[in-house]
Protein backbone atom coordinates (compact mmCIF):
# COMPACT_ATOMS: atom_id res chain seq x y z
CA UNK A 1 0.00 0.00 0.00
CA UNK A 2 2.84 2.38 0.86
CA UNK A 3 4.50 1.78 -2.50
CA UNK A 4 1.29 2.60 -4.38
CA UNK A 5 0.98 5.92 -2.55
CA UNK A 6 4.68 6.70 -3.09
CA UNK A 7 4.36 5.87 -6.79
CA UNK A 8 1.38 8.23 -7.00
CA UNK A 9 3.43 11.07 -5.51
CA UNK A 10 6.28 10.36 -7.93
CA UNK A 11 3.90 10.43 -10.91
CA UNK A 12 2.34 13.68 -9.68
CA UNK A 13 5.80 15.24 -9.29
CA UNK A 14 6.77 14.17 -12.80
CA UNK A 15 3.58 15.65 -14.27
CA UNK A 16 4.18 18.92 -12.40
CA UNK A 17 7.80 19.09 -13.56
CA UNK A 18 6.82 18.48 -17.19
CA UNK A 19 4.07 21.11 -16.98
CA UNK A 20 6.45 23.68 -15.50
CA UNK A 21 9.03 22.96 -18.21
CA UNK A 22 6.42 23.46 -20.94
CA UNK A 23 5.25 26.70 -19.30
CA UNK A 24 8.85 27.97 -19.00
CA UNK A 25 9.41 27.24 -22.71
CA UNK A 26 6.40 29.31 -23.76
CA UNK A 27 7.20 32.15 -21.33
CA UNK A 28 10.75 32.42 -22.65
CA UNK A 29 9.51 32.34 -26.23
CA UNK A 30 7.01 35.15 -25.50
CA UNK A 31 9.68 37.20 -23.72
CA UNK A 32 12.08 36.71 -26.63
CA UNK A 33 9.42 37.94 -29.02
CA UNK A 34 8.86 41.02 -26.82
CA UNK A 35 12.61 41.64 -26.45
CA UNK A 36 12.73 41.06 -22.68
CA UNK A 37 15.10 38.11 -22.52
CA UNK A 38 18.50 38.11 -20.88
CA UNK A 39 21.46 36.53 -22.67
CA UNK A 40 21.53 32.83 -21.81
CA UNK A 41 24.64 31.41 -20.18
CA UNK A 42 26.01 28.01 -21.09
CA UNK A 43 26.71 27.26 -17.43
CA UNK A 44 23.82 28.42 -15.20
CA UNK A 45 25.73 27.77 -11.97
CA UNK A 46 28.61 29.99 -13.12
CA UNK A 47 26.71 33.11 -12.06
CA UNK A 48 26.05 31.69 -8.60
CA UNK A 49 29.74 30.85 -8.08
CA UNK A 50 31.02 34.17 -9.46
CA UNK A 51 32.30 37.02 -7.32
CA UNK A 52 29.55 39.19 -5.73
CA UNK A 53 30.62 42.18 -7.83
CA UNK A 54 30.40 40.21 -11.07
CA UNK A 55 26.68 39.42 -10.91
CA UNK A 56 24.14 41.17 -13.08
CA UNK A 57 21.98 42.14 -10.08
CA UNK A 58 23.39 45.14 -8.18
CA UNK A 59 23.65 44.96 -4.42
CA UNK A 60 21.26 47.30 -2.66
CA UNK A 61 21.09 48.50 0.89
CA UNK A 62 18.17 47.18 2.99
CA UNK A 63 16.61 50.65 3.11
CA UNK A 64 16.55 51.23 -0.65
CA UNK A 65 13.50 50.25 -2.72
CA UNK A 66 14.01 46.85 -4.29
CA UNK A 67 12.05 47.51 -7.43
CA UNK A 68 11.41 50.07 -10.12
CA UNK A 69 8.46 50.69 -12.40
CA UNK A 70 8.91 51.03 -16.13
CA UNK A 71 5.67 52.71 -17.29
CA UNK A 72 4.17 53.68 -20.62
CA UNK A 73 5.14 50.88 -22.96
CA UNK A 74 2.38 49.56 -25.19
CA UNK A 75 1.35 46.01 -24.43
CA UNK A 76 1.31 43.68 -27.41
CA UNK A 77 -0.77 40.57 -27.11
CA UNK A 78 0.70 37.16 -28.01
CA UNK A 79 -1.17 37.35 -31.32
CA UNK A 80 0.70 40.54 -32.17
CA UNK A 81 -2.05 43.17 -32.29
CA UNK A 82 -1.59 46.01 -29.78
CA UNK A 83 -4.43 46.60 -27.36
CA UNK A 84 -5.84 50.11 -27.25
CA UNK A 85 -5.63 52.17 -24.11
CA UNK A 86 -3.49 49.83 -22.07
CA UNK A 87 -0.36 50.74 -20.17
CA UNK A 88 2.22 48.21 -19.14
CA UNK A 89 3.97 48.34 -15.78
CA UNK A 90 6.92 45.98 -15.45
CA UNK A 91 7.89 45.14 -11.89
CA UNK A 92 11.58 44.21 -11.65
CA UNK A 93 12.78 42.68 -8.40
CA UNK A 94 16.35 42.24 -7.17
CA UNK A 95 16.18 38.51 -7.91
CA UNK A 96 16.15 37.07 -11.45
CA UNK A 97 12.98 35.71 -13.05
CA UNK A 98 10.63 37.74 -10.83
CA UNK A 99 8.92 40.08 -13.27
CA UNK A 100 5.20 40.80 -12.97
CA UNK A 101 3.37 42.54 -15.78
CA UNK A 102 0.02 44.22 -15.17
CA UNK A 103 -2.08 45.72 -17.94
CA UNK A 104 -4.78 48.25 -17.15
CA UNK A 105 -7.30 49.89 -19.44
CA UNK A 106 -6.92 53.55 -18.60
CA UNK A 107 -9.65 56.03 -19.57
CA UNK A 108 -8.66 59.02 -21.66
CA UNK A 109 -10.00 61.43 -19.06
CA UNK A 110 -10.92 60.75 -15.44
CA UNK A 111 -14.05 62.74 -14.48
CA UNK A 112 -13.87 65.06 -11.45
CA UNK A 113 -15.14 63.77 -8.12
CA UNK A 114 -18.81 64.16 -7.38
CA UNK A 115 -20.11 67.13 -5.41
CA UNK A 116 -21.53 66.36 -1.95
CA UNK A 117 -25.26 65.78 -1.73
CA UNK A 118 -27.58 68.26 -0.02
CA UNK A 119 -28.04 67.44 3.64
CA UNK A 120 -31.02 68.07 5.89
CA UNK A 121 -29.31 71.12 7.41
CA UNK A 122 -29.22 72.82 3.97
CA UNK A 123 -32.95 72.30 3.33
CA UNK A 124 -35.45 74.66 5.00
CA UNK A 125 -38.08 72.78 7.01
CA UNK A 126 -41.13 74.84 5.95
CA UNK A 127 -40.45 74.45 2.21
CA UNK A 128 -41.96 71.60 0.24
CA UNK A 129 -39.57 68.86 -0.83
CA UNK A 130 -38.68 68.95 -4.56
CA UNK A 131 -39.09 65.17 -4.65
CA UNK A 132 -42.80 65.53 -3.88
CA UNK A 133 -43.42 67.77 -6.91
CA UNK A 134 -41.26 65.90 -9.45
CA UNK A 135 -41.59 62.40 -10.83
CA UNK A 136 -39.76 59.74 -8.83
CA UNK A 137 -36.70 58.28 -10.54
CA UNK A 138 -36.17 54.62 -9.66
CA UNK A 139 -32.80 54.21 -11.40
CA UNK A 140 -29.65 53.61 -9.42
CA UNK A 141 -27.30 56.59 -9.16
CA UNK A 142 -24.08 56.38 -11.15
CA UNK A 143 -21.13 54.92 -9.28
CA UNK A 144 -18.07 57.10 -8.71
CA UNK A 145 -15.29 56.77 -11.27
CA UNK A 146 -12.55 54.21 -10.56
CA UNK A 147 -9.15 55.39 -9.43
CA UNK A 148 -6.33 54.03 -11.57
CA UNK A 149 -2.95 53.59 -9.93
CA UNK A 150 0.13 51.56 -10.82
CA UNK A 151 0.35 48.20 -9.05
CA UNK A 152 1.68 48.17 -5.51
CA UNK A 153 5.33 47.35 -5.00
CA UNK A 154 5.91 43.80 -3.89
CA UNK A 155 7.77 43.52 -0.60
UniProtKB/Swiss-Prot annotation:
Query: Signal as a keyword?
Result: yes
**Record organism:** Schizosaccharomyces pombe (strain 972 / ATCC 24843)
Identify the keywords attached in UniProt to this record, alphabetized: Signal
Say which domain of life the source belongs to.
Eukaryota
The protein's name is: Uncharacterized proline-rich protein C70.10
User: What are the start and end residues of every segment in region (Disordered)?
Assistant: 35-155
Show the ranges annotated as biased composition (Polar residues): 118-128
Signal peptide (from-to): 1-21
Kindly list the GO CC terms recorded for this protein: fungal-type vacuole
Amino acid sequence: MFFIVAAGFVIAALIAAIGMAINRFFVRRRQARAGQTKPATTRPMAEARARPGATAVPRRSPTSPQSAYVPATVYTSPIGSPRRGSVRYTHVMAHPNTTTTVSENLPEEVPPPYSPAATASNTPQNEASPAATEAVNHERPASPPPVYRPPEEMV
